[in-house]
Curated annotation (Swiss-Prot):
Catalyzes the dephosphorylation of undecaprenyl diphosphate (UPP). Confers resistance to bacitracin. The keyword Cell wall biogenesis/degradation applies. The gene is uppP2. Belongs to the UppP family. It comes from the Bacteria. The chain crosses the membrane at residues 43-63, 88-108, 119-139, 149-169, 194-214, 226-246, 254-274. GO terms for molecular function: undecaprenyl-diphosphatase activity. It is a multi-pass membrane protein. One of its GO terms (cellular component) is plasma membrane. The keyword Membrane applies. This is Undecaprenyl-diphosphatase 2. Bacitracin is thought to be involved in the inhibition of peptidoglycan synthesis by sequestering undecaprenyl diphosphate, thereby reducing the pool of lipid carrier available.
Length: 278
C-alpha cells in the first residue's frame, strides 16, 4: 500500500519535531512507519529528503551566522584583508567535521539503508545513547563557548555526528553529548551541532533526491514534498524554542524519554506487535 497524504504530513510533522531534539528523528520515522495504515518503513531516502526541509530551517534561523562565518572563511583564504579568526576557524571546522559522516556514509551505504534499520538496533541505540547524553549533561564542565572551539574538538564532533547514521543514535544527541563531554556549554554544543549538520544533511538529502529521480518512489513525490515543507515549518519553530530552553534547562527529560521509548520498542518487538525489519 502506498503512503497517503495524511501519513506523509504526519511524518513531516514528526521529522520537524524531532530533528533538532536529541531523540533521533530517523528512529521516530522508522518506528512510526510500522503503525501507519500503509504499514511500511518510509525508507532512508524519504528520511534524507525530508531532512532537507529541516536543514532549510537551520539556514533561515542561522543565516546571519552562516554568512558571517562564510565571509570570514573567504577573506582568510582569498587574503582579502582583516577577518575574524574564530569565525574563519569555525568555517574550516564545519568543513573538516563533515568529512567523517560523508566517508562513513558512503562506505557503509548498504548497511545504513538496510541492516542498520533493524528496530532492535534502533531500540538499543535509543537507550544507550540516551544514557550517554545523561552522563554528559551531568559531568560536563560547560565552560567553553562556541568561539573557543578548537580543531581537535571540532573533528571529534564530526565523528560523533557520524554515529547518527545508525537510527536511534540521534545526530544532535551524539554531537551535543560530545560537546558536553568536551566541556562546552549546552548552547554552544547545540549551535555547533546545528551548523555542522548543514553540509552533511544537505549532501545526503540532495544525493538521495537526484538518485531517486526517474526511479519508482514508494512514498510518492507529492507526499514527499508535503512532508518536507511541513518539516521546514515545524523545524524552525523547534529551533527557536530549543535554543531558549538549553541555555538554562537540563537534557534529562530527553534522556528519560529516549530510555522509555527504547524499552517500549523492545517490548513491542518481543511480543510480536511489530516486526524488526532491516
Amino acid at each position: 500500500m502506498s503512503m497517503g497524504w495524511m501519513e506523509a504530513g504526519f511524518l513531516g510533522l514528526l521529522q520537524g519535531l524531532t530533528e533538532f531534539l536529541p531523540v533521533s528523528s530517523s528512529a521516530h520515522l522508522r518506528i512510526a512507519g510500522e503503525f501507519l495504515p500503509s504499514g511500511a518503513d518510509p525508507g532512508a531516502a524519504f528520511t534524507a529528503i525530508t531532512q532537507i526541509g529541516t536543514e532549510m530551517a537551520v539556514l533561515v534561523y542561522f543565516w546571519s551566522d552562516i554568512m558571517r562565518i562564510a565571509a570570514a572563511w573567504l577573506r582568510q583564504n582569498l587574503r582579502l584583508g582583516e577577518y575574524n579568526k574564530a569565525d574563519a576557524r569555525l568555517g574550516w571546522l564545519i568543513i573538516v567535521g563533515s568529512v567523517p559522516i560523508v566517508f562513513l556514509g558512503l562506505f557503509f551505504k548498504d548497511a545504513i539503508e538496510h541492516s542498520l534499520r533493524n528496530l532492535y538496533i534502533t531500540a538499543v541505540m535509543l537507550i544507550v545513547f540516551g544514557i550517554v547524553l545523561g552522563l554528559a549533561d551531568r559531568i560536563g564542565e560547560k565552560r567553553y563557548k562556541l568561539n573557543q572551539l578548537i580543531w581537535r574538538d571540532g573533528i571529534l564532533f564530526g565523528f560523533a555526528q557520524a554515529m547518527a547514521l545508525i537510527p536511534g543514535v540521534s545526530r544532535s544527541g551524539g554531537t551535543i553529548s560530545a560537546g558536553l563531554l568536551l566541556g562546552y556549554t549546552r548552547e554552544a554544543a547545540a549551535r555547533y551541532s546545528f551548523l555542522l549538520a548543514v553540509p552533511a544533511v544537505f549532501g545526503s538529502g540532495f544525493y538521495q533526491l537526484f538518485k531517486s529521480i526517474g526511479e519508482d518512489n514508494p512514498v510518492g513525490w507529492g507526499q514527499t514534498g508535503l512532508a518536507t515543507l511541513i518539516a521546514f515549518i515545524v523545524g524552525y519553530a523547534v529551533i527557536v524554542v530549543f535554543l531558549k530552553l538549553v541555555s538554562t534547562k537540563s537534557y534529562m527529560p530527553f534522556v528519560w524519554y529516549r530510555v522509555v521509548i527504547g524499552f517500549i520498542l523492545l517490548a513491542l518487538l518481543g511480543t510480536g506487535v511489530i516486526s524488526a525489519g532491516g
